[in-house]
Amino acid sequence: MVVGDEAHTFKAKSLTTIMNRLVNANLRVGTTGTIDNAIANQMTLEGNFGPVNKVISTKELIDSDTLSQLTVQCLVLKYGEEERKLCRGLKYQEEIDFIVSHEKRNRFIVNLTCDQKGNSLVLYNLVHKHGKPLYDSFVEKLKGTGRKVFFVSGAVNAEERERIREITEKEKNAIIVASVGTFSTGINIVNLHNIVFASPTKSQIRVLQSIGRGLRKTEDGQGTTIYDLADDLAWKKKKNYTLNHAIQRVKIYTIEKFKYKIHEVPV
């Protein structure tokens, strides 16, 4: 018998190799809250465990009051004409580097997060280019206020992450600046009210797993708000890479029947 938790990760070569060698394991059970919509990944998953049986949706769990109420605020950052023109020919990684190092954008993230009530999780992708500078900005802004700010990356060991999680659950307005890889999957924070998507992504798994961090019901009954940052650097009719990623995320919210609103914010 094989039981695979977070079964969506079983598309990794190392795990599929193990599954292929378990020729005598006739009973296979895989559980997950998120399945990739890519056909190839679905086929791999079904090859490892068998046909998918969707027991219940996240929306149904929210409606039944099992999970916290969820609202997604899509904040489309509108850049000026000069910056749009400057970025029109950038390759994907160059666009990412421009976005994560944009001073006004990072200041907006810090101010937005600090203005929210309750505990907040800020998710980033690049540690040295984005996560650490954001953390330093939070520390500087909140100096002398007594408000706790934590930094989590792959370099922070599991024991320290657990300590941060436990401290946060006892706080009312703490901020965790964490890498997507360490805090988007498998970490449950009961007392979490706000999640800020500071870095672009179009991965359905990553988006839904990240949202899942904030769906545990809180003692105060406050719902969870997702702040999804999109970057509009479109030039004439050509959309930039990360704006297309944002469009994909909105499609995910629509499919999952999440409540969302789109707001334009000048940078």
Predicted features and spans:
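Long, hydrophobic alpha-helical segments
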Residues: T225, K239-V267
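Conserved SF2 helicase motif VI
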Residues: I35, N194, K202-I226
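Conserved segment of the helicase C-terminal RecA-like domain
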Residues: R213-I247
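Conserved Walker B
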Residues: V2, E6-H8, F183, P200-T201, ...
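Conserved interdomain hinge at the start of the Helicase C-terminal
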Residues: E82-N125, K129-K143
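Short, conserved loop/helix-junction motifs that constitute active-site signature segments
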Residues: M1, M19-A25, V190, G214-G221
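Conserved helicase ATPase core of P-loop NTP-dependent helicases/translocases
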Residues: L121, H130-P133, G146-I187
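Post-DEXD/H (motif II) to motif III coupling segment of the RecA-like Helicase ATP-binding lobe
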Residues: V3, H8-Q73, Y253
